């Protein structure tokens, strides 16, 4: 049987890069990893709590963390940075304080910067959030998938595959439905494929959304 590998891990070092850039002694590695997870969760929770965009999309593409001996540099890639840049110094300062409280890192400086994503709907995380918002508002899953594909087509992608699994439309038996538009060559290593797996809670239970976007071939 075919083994389904994560497309991002499969392409690390060729078309994908690590989102955490730091070195550590083997014994301290797990601590560093947990620290990264705390930073990411804290930022996502802050954005979720304080952001009210009509589409319900937070627009976090990914969060990059670079660590040196005395500095932690966090770069947030946002699709819709209006929320954080409106009251920029105040909002970012507040976010920094929140993250520092969570980490309890007194002897290290924390810098947070924001980078705008040119085509937000080229990023599967942003797209998954959009679909999740639609499903929570009880829009039919087929309609939500169709709309998501239309949004990516405007971003000049070469192909997209969307899969939603769970109790679709409140049916008793869980199933998976998927739709593909264009090419999605998962076995081609030089093909740059963005992927994300996202969980959404609806009134019928938990649904899993998976999105593969074929951006370009190198």
UniProtKB/Swiss-Prot annotation:
InterPro entries: KH_dom-like_a/b (IPR015946), KH_dom_type_2 (IPR004044), KH_sf_prok-type (IPR009019), Ribosomal_S3_C_sf (IPR036419), Ribosomal_uS3_bac-typ (IPR005704), Ribosomal_uS3_C (IPR001351), Ribosomal_uS3_CS (IPR018280). Gene3D superfamilies: 3.30.300.20, Ribosomal protein S3, C-terminal domain (3.30.1140.32). It comes from Populus alba. SUPFAM superfamilies: Prokaryotic type KH domain (KH-domain type II) (SSF54814), Ribosomal protein S3 C-terminal domain (SSF54821). Its main location: plastid. It comes from the Eukaryota. The lineage of its organism: Eukaryota, Viridiplantae, Streptophyta, Embryophyta, Tracheophyta. The keyword Glycoprotein does not apply. This is Small ribosomal subunit protein uS3c. GO terms for molecular function: rRNA binding; structural constituent of ribosome. GO terms for cellular component: chloroplast; cytosolic small ribosomal subunit. GO terms for biological process: translation. Keywords: Chloroplast, Plastid, Ribonucleoprotein, Ribosomal protein, RNA-binding, rRNA-binding. CDD domains: KH-II_30S_S3 (cd02412). Belongs to the universal ribosomal protein uS3 family.
């Amino acid at each position: 049987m075919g083994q389904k590998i994560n497309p991002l891990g499969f392409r690390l070092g060729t078309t994908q890069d690590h989102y955490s850039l730091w070195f550590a002694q083997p014994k301290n590695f797990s601590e560093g990893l947990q620290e990264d997870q705390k930073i990411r969760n804290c930022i996502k929770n802050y954005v979720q709590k304080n952001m009210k965009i009509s589409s319900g999309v937070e627009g976090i593409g990914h969060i990059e963390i670079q660590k040196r001996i005395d500095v932690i540099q966090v770069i947030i890639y946002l699709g819709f940075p209006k929320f954080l840049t409106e009251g920029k110094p105040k909002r970012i300062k507040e976010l920094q304080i929140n993250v520092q409280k969570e980490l309890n890192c007194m002897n290290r400086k924390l810098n947070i910067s924001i980078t705008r994503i040119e085509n937000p709907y080229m990023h599967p995380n942003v797209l998954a959030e959009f679909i999740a918002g639609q499903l929570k508002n009880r829009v039919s899953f087929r309609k939500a998938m169709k709309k998501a594909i239309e949004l990516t087509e405007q971003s000049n992608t070469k192909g997209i595959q969307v899969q939603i699994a769970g109790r679709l439309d409140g049916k008793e038996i869980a199933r998976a439905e998927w739709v593909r538009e264009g090419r999605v060559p998962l076995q081609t290593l030089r093909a740059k494929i963005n992927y994300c797996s996202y969980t959404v809670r609806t009134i019928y239970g938990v649904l899993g959304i998976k999105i593969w976007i074929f951006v370009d071939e190198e």
